[in-house]
Every structure is written in structure tokens, then in C-alpha cells.
Amino acid sequence: MRKISEPTERLVPDRCREALYNEMMTALGRIAEEHMHLPAFRFFVDITRSWQEKMCGEMEKPLVVVAGTGIPDELLRAAGGVPSYILGGSREACMYSDDRVPRDADPVSRSILGYLYQMAVKDTSSVLILIPLYSDSMRKIAYQLNLAGWNVVTVDMPPLQDSSTALEKWKEQVLQATVAVADHVHSRITATSLKKAVREAVKARSEMQMFLRTVTCEENVFSPMARILVQNSYYYTDDLAEWTRNLGRLRDEIWQTICRKGDRYRDAPRILLMGSPVFFPNEKLPSLFSDAHLHVVRNIDPSTEVFEMIPHIAKAGNSAERILTAVAEEWYRHDVSGAYIRNETLRQKIMEILETDEVEGVVYHILKGQIEPDFELAWFEEFFEKADIPVFRMETDYQYQDVEQLRIRMEAFSEMLTQRRFSRRAMMRSIIRNGPTFVMRCQSRSD
């Protein structure tokens, strides 16, 4: 396996940057055209475009790169470093990292490594890479980058979530990562900078919660792919306060459009999406949902659960250490990544969703190579079976060879959910029309 810092052909990174840029610009142009009726959406398209241009441009000043999600972003901002997140989602980046990653690496890890490989960095010491170790693939990437001479700081996710020892280990690692960022950008962590960063993050996440409740009303107004782009842009913005204001404007525009339409809800099966995360510009899964007429009412994965994290720092006073501890504990309590042997937080979250949202089916998305979500699938299948909610396990990657096969299966799943809805409505009409005697006849037949 070749080292990342030693490409076999000098022009490869240039071709990779061009391919990545074209892939992103094509996807952005298409989605911007589809949502021209929402002027505020342009802001989030521009943020994503600026991020792409930065990642494909010349890197000169000290840069803090976060590979994936899972590290408290408010602490990194408070430390003075505006983090440049690489989330994944790029098929082109996967292709350019194929011969530099283990064969069993998942598409997200491949995409992250492809982005890191193409970066135009004159001195690798000017880049600090933070890597949350929530999967086996991320551990392998961290090892490869270390071997290649990059400046890497890892944050290990403890395998046990209900252990006080694990919590202390997590807080210690988060503190070390925050200090490493401050040292890298020659800044200081203060209680004032921490409070400011936490306040901005709380406002942004609270606004995102309201935004998501609005867009789930009517997907004809705002597509699943556009929703993913807006969610991802949280990680790409350099000014979180400005991002929050524009998200509020976009939410108002969407709501006004919904009110003008009159019909707030689509007559489509309402599903819960969980498992592996979906990142822009990977349009594969959202397009399948649209083709199969499935309405995603909730999406739960490690990248989206950050919007549920609202640290309470009022009791921390002016102590920077207490604020750091409060933030780290909040992230630890809400983490739904696959790092844990038993992810009780994820299980509890699913139970809460079923109590508050009408869910007719579940799409359990698994990217090939991400074995962690598969470990939890058996428990969820049994749980959803008891709740009488069908589960569709969909394993795929960033390639498009299996799209037609997946579309057929997805449409069959959608049709099955629709028929179940009609059957239940027919039974309810019979109960209303015939009264308790109809229920007694049904019970006697089942016996």
C-alpha cells in the first residue's frame, strides 16, 4: 500500500481536485435550480461551494481538519480554530483513495481520505487532523496518516457508555484535543470564548430543530437532498451566528410556501431513516426516496444528533474547566455512534421518536464496510416487530451499479406500506360503522 504523502504521479492530486470540484458543482447547480422558489436557500449552497473551493485550493495558514463527526465543534471554535470538516459523501474522492485504503474500508472513510490526499498542502505540519475513532475504518485511517507523517490527534470513543471510567476517559481526550487545537493556531482557551461558542452552537442547534420540524410537513417544498445539504452546512460555516440567522429566514420561507399550498402533508408512507449517515453530494439514497414516494419524517445518525445537544453551562460560572466538562458530558450522553457495544442512547432515542412521531416504516441504511450499524440491527428488528413497524435493510455504497435493483426493492417496500395503511383505514371504518361486534368477530376468527 502506497503512503498518502507519496503519490505515484504528480498530476493525480490535480485531476482529483478537478473531479471533486466538478462533482460538487454539478450537484449544487442541480439542487439550487430545483429550489429557486426559496431565495434564502442560496446562502447554504454558497457555503457548501466555498467549503469545496477551500478544500481544493492552496493551504497556507494553519488548518484544523476534522475527519468525520463526533468531536464537540463548539470547543474547537472556542479554541480559536475554525474547523474544516470532511464528512464524506463524495464518490470521486472514494475512487482516488481506493488503492490507499484497506479493502474493507467503508465509503465514508474512503471519501474522507480521498479529500485529505488531494489537499494542496506545502507543509503537512501546518495541518492538524482530528479523528474520532468511532469505527474500525477510522482507526486504520488514523494509523495510515500517522505513518505518512501527518499531525494527527485522535479521540477514542469508549466501548461502554454507562461507565464512569469511560466518561472520564472521554472528557480527558476531548480536553486534550481542544488544547491541541489552541496550540496549533496559537490561541488561548478562556471562559469567555467558551461561553460565546456554546451560546452560538445552542442557538444554531435550536434553530435547526425548528427547521427540521417544519420541513417534515411537506417534502414537495423542500427535498430530502436539500435537507441534507443544509444539515451538512452546519459543519462547513465559518460564521455560526450568520448561519443561524439565514436558517431562520429559510424556515420562514418554507412555512409560507406550505401555507400557500394549503395541503401540508403528502399522502406518502412516513418512514424513519437510521443507520449509516448520508452526506452531500451523495444523491443516491434521497433520489430513491423520491422515486419510491417515501416521506422521511425523522433521520437519526451521529451527524444529525448533534442538533439535539444543548449544553447547560449556567452552573459552570466563569470556570473554563467546568464549561469544558459540561459540553463533553452533553456530547457523551447524546452520542449515537457505532462505537459502543450496546448503544443504549440510540435505543432510547428510537423509543422517544415512536412516541412523538407517526412512523409507518423504517429504512435501515448500511454502507458497505460499516459493520457497526449491523451489530445493532438484530435488536432493532425485534423491537420494531413488536411495534408492528416493517424494517427495510438497505446495504449499498457510493457507486451507482445497484440503483435499479434498490429502486425496485424500495418501491415494493413503499407499496407494502401503502397497502398496510389502506387496510388499517378500512378496518377503522368498519369498526366505526359496525361497533364493538366487528372487533369481537375479528378476534374470534384470529383465535
Residue ranges and their predicted role:
Residues 65-74, 132-139, 275-281, 368-375:
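Gly/Ser/Thr-rich loops at beta-strand to alpha-helix junctions
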Residues 113-179:
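Acidic/His-rich segments in extracytoplasmic proteins that coordinate ligands and/or metal ions
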Residues 126, 354-364:
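Proline-aspartate-enriched helix->loop->beta-strand connector
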Residues 2-63, 175, 179-311, 321:
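A charged, amphipathic alpha-helical module
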Residues 54, 61-121, 141, 146:
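An N-terminal, globular interaction/scaffold subdomain
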Residues 58, 68-70, 74-89, 94-97, ...:
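Redox- and metal-dependent alpha/beta enzyme cores, enriched for Fe-S-associated oxidoreductases
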Residues 115-116, 341-358, 375-376:
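A short, acidic, amphipathic alpha-helical segment used as a generic capping/interface helix at domain edges
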